[in-house]
């Protein structure tokens, strides 16, 4: 005769096997079923994904190739910038031009931005672990904060020197050397713009969406845990996910490209100032005016970055997400009664997470409602990492 406890164990085992067949996940049962003891502690579940759910084994090869291509572009840009920074520093000192040194400081800010993007692409290949369950994306934020502080320090030194020279007068500025160095800088910026602007990335038609929601169904005083895994086999949804992943991977290249365009404009300004001073040396005050103007521009380029950093560190709701509209959209689902404990935050820029409690009608099927909610959040708000706790009314 089968005892009730043994019968319960066998039933649980059968349900787990059915769950394996349905969702194609790997489940290893380490504990032994005995008639004298029933335990679920020995059940070990292994999913083929990173703990944070940001990566997918089936697309890791494609992502690695595209990540390597982006890293090569950024590495070349960093090397070009680093070499020309040395040229500008030497040329600025010899020409006695603060404007060239300011351009070098701006270029240094670009090197910092490129290096952060490069490190971000490299670190995005690191796998999450139990200690760093969300991965290492926050390193990018910390690096950006350090680079901003360095840029502000350099800009402050240059502004101070420009003010001192305005008050006390400055030595002669060699307009010809100033023009030549800035002209070479413009050529370097054009080369980098061509490098970063020409995207060789190609789309691929296969992707697997591992986004998952976790629902905890609390009803009539009995707590049960349900895990929902969205396999995402619909081809149109796969295409949308792939396009969005492509945009996320290219955002570093696009940011670097915009930095280069800004540098090109500044190089043109220094060239014009150098040409005027070359033609009329007594107009050397233009060098100091260029220094003050471009220092303000350098500081201005860091404001947006600083705002993004503070929003991530304060775990503010990302600006591209309207939590009121999101909550309203979830509540418009027929089976949903209310939404509370809604939290939306970012691990780093572009990596969004959401957690909330959703109260549903007593007769509603939790899995079906969870499917609808996750589909809505991914489709309308592009949040791929969603954790939802289902509660009965």
Curated annotation (Swiss-Prot):
TM regions (residue ranges): 73-93, 106-126, 139-159, 177-197, 258-278, 285-305
UniProt record similarity statement: Belongs to the cation diffusion facilitator (CDF) transporter (TC 2.A.4) family. SLC30A subfamily.
Keywords from the UniProt entry: Ion transport, Membrane, Metal-binding, Transmembrane, Transmembrane helix, Transport, Zinc, Zinc transport
Topological domain ranges for the Cytoplasmic compartment: 1-72, 127-138, 198-257, 306-393
Protein name: Metal tolerance protein A2
Region (Required for zinc-binding): 198-233
Role of this protein: Involved in sequestration of excess zinc in the cytoplasm into vacuoles to maintain zinc homeostasis.
Membrane-protein topology: Multi-pass membrane protein
GO MF annotations in UniProt: metal ion binding; monoatomic cation transmembrane transporter activity
Keyword hit for Metal-binding: yes
Annotated organism of origin: Arabidopsis thaliana (Mouse-ear cress)
């Amino acid at each position: 005769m089968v005892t009730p406890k043994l019968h319960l164990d066998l039933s649980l085992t059968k349900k787990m096997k059915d769950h394996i067949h349905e969702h194609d996940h790997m489940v290893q049962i380490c504990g032994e079923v005995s008639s004298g003891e029933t335990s679920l502690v020995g059940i070990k579940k292994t999913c083929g994904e990173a703990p944070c759910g940001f990566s997918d084994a089936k697309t890791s090869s494609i992502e690695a190739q595209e990540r390597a291509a982006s890293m090569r572009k950024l590495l070349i840009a960093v090397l070009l910038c680093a070499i020309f920074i040395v040229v500008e520093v030497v040329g600025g000192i010899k020409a006695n031009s603060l404007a060239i040194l300011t351009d070098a400081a701006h270029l240094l800010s670009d090197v910092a931005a490129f290096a952060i993007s490069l490190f971000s692409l490299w670190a995005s290949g690191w796998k999450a672990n139990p200690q760093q369950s969300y991965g290492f994306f926050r390193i990018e934020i910390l690096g950006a904060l350090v680079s901003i502080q360095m840029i502000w320090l350099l800009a402050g030194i240059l502004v101070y020197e420009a003010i001192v020279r305005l008050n006390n007068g400055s030595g002669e500025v060699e307009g010809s050397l100033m023009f030549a160095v800035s002209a070479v800088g413009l050529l370097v910026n054009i080369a980098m713009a061509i490098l970063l602007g020409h995207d060789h990335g190609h789309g691929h038609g296969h992707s697997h969406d591992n986004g998952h929601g976790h629902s905890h169904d609390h009803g009539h005083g009995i707590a049960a845990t349900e895990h929902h895994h969205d396999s995402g086999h619909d081809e149109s949804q796969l295409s949308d996910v792939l396009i969005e992943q492509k945009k996320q991977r290219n955002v570093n290249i696009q940011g670097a490209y915009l930095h280069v365009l800004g540098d090109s404009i500044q190089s043109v300004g220094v060239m014009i100032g150098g040409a005027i001073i070359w033609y009329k040396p007594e107009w050397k005050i233009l060098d100091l005016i260029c220094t003050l103007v471009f220092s303000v521009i350098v500081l201005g380029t860091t404001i947006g970055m600083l705002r993004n950093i503070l929003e991530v560190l304060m775990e503010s709701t990302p600006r591209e997400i309207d939590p009121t509209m999101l909550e309203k959209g979830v509540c418009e689902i027929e089976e949903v009664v209310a939404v509370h404990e809604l939290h939306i935050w970012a691990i780093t820029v572009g990596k969004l997470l959401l957690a909330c409690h959703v109260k549903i009608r007593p007769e509603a099927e939790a899995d079906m409602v969870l499917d609808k909610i996750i589909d809505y959040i991914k489709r309308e708000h592009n949040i791929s990492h969603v954790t939802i706790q289902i509660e009965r009314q």
